[in-house]
């Protein structure tokens, strides 16, 4: 049994480890040494150059800018273009549970932890993933009282997975959907469950052991399956975080052991309605969906397995907000959540039915008073009197390190925690507001797009289905909540900035023509994003593959481009990895991150701690931006320092890396320049 440490003992250990010599820790870490650019990141002068991880001997690659105002080519590494591709709702263990890396590399997943065997059956250490039943009546419980472990998991449910595939034929799909390789369109015409929605999923065994569930044993990889709950307070409860349970290898005390219980007790929320009569563990339409995982060892996710073995994979990249799609895309774009404001940009009070209340309704076990996509999604997290707030704030205060900005909650601000529509339509028209609209007003908060524009670094957001702002392409499957800049008044009321929102065919054209901006964020439509129930992972693989092959077909572009492939969040699936609480909002579970470039080859697995805002930090470091998005944005956090024997847990928490560890620039060479000239300290 792990030794339990209180806050003072853990803090003393971390300080002592740092005092023994950061240089010693750095030299001992061969796979993930700490980045040494903390001084540079703290508003260093332009002329000062500090070491960036990924270059030999702490050296920095400089590229002289082109003449003119565009500073897009002034980079500190050979990377002049970065493309971020964002899928939907898969944890790291859900995808890479049984992945075995190339020789000399190590990965932390269900297989390496002994939780499952390569054939998907429970492994010798399956007890690490044991799930519990619990009791939560009255006030919201962050770590509810355990009652008993499950003897068997609740049965699987079909939920919203389609009975039939969305298209009758590959030809019909290809006539509407441009985002797949030609050979992949049959996937849109196959894989329906053959069962009604919200019934027992008889494709799975009726009796399931208390363990992660191998989907490959029951389904084909091309089959549709249900989606688990992925909302803010629900995910906090699923992780079951208690500072009293903190250990040296788990500073958060999160036990990750209430996934099915939260699914079956509250699911996606009450929307303010009473608990249904005759309530069972199937009423929420989920069962134990959260415990499902794909099996790469048996051929699932073949393209993502190939990319991992060829390029670089992170096994310590996290969703940045507990909960769902909208809030995590917002965090990527703003480095912090956004709040409900008035026309002047000041915090205001939202309609009462849109304020979260995760307390249990009287007479129920964890059925929330007010929460849901048609219910509560705002919280004034600086006010301990707000339901659910004190429990999280007290937990953060009890941790062996200080939360970012004390939790990063502005006074009197109601922050959006889940999915609401953005404040603008694609054509720049303000979206309708009101108690029944579930739309957040336009925000004046600063964001990555504005930062890049101020520094004259080119950018675009390519959202499939944009259709020149009509948002109706590909059968109306454009994801409006995924575009962080649709929430921004400064972007959407400026025609030049608004025009940088484009479509998938614009991305293809820019790749072919060599007109790609420095920073690109690309989002598939709802058909291809890999979201469980409404999509499949093989469809997202196809979306990624088409873009990767197009970039590689342009040798000039491939020479200086990095393609980063990740997800918006874990979707509520179980994951065994460490989670670092940064502030009130997260982090959440691990999600996959692949970095594809000629400087990321070799099948390396990188263990540095990252989340979505690490992308912002990469952009700022690569383009030498001596400014952060805002004073409260997470790109102000330092890069992690960790012990070589446990690179997953930052000693200087809270800390997130800048993704430079995903690259090896030692082979960088520009024709016509000596290496000694290119590499400077």
Feature annotation, model-predicted:
Residues 29-681:
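N-terminal pro-sequences and low-complexity stem/linker regions of secreted or lumenal proteins
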Residues 2-27:
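Gram-negative bacterial Sec-dependent N-terminal signal peptides
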